Amino acid sequence: MNTKDFYSFYDLREMDILSISSKGNDLIILLNADVEMELMANGFRGGFDLSFLQEVTFKDCRININLTSPIDIKRYEYQDDKLVIQANKETIIIPEREVVIKKIKTNHV
C-alpha cells in the first residue's frame, strides 16, 4: 500500500466538517466521504480507500498555525468569513477565503 500526498486548493465553506483535532503541530479535520467525489470530478484518479471518512490536514498558506500538542478542541463555528476553533488554551482563526493546502493520504491500488 503506497501513500501519496495530493495538494489542492479549496474553500473551507465547502467542506463538510465532522470533527477537528490535532496531531503534533497539524490541525486534523475529519471530512465526509463526499470529498472523494469532488476530487475525482476535478480530475484526480487514485483508488481511494476512505473507509467512509477521510482524514485531512489543513495548513493555511499565509498564516502559520502553530498548535501546542496536545490541544483539546472544545468547539468550532463559522463567524463572518472565518472558521473559528475554540481550544483549551487558544483560539484558532482560519480565514475562509485564504488559500488552504489540503494534504490527503491516498491509498493507490
Indicate where each model-derived feature is located.
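Surface-exposed, interaction-prone regions used to assemble/regulate multi-protein complexes
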Residues: 1-109
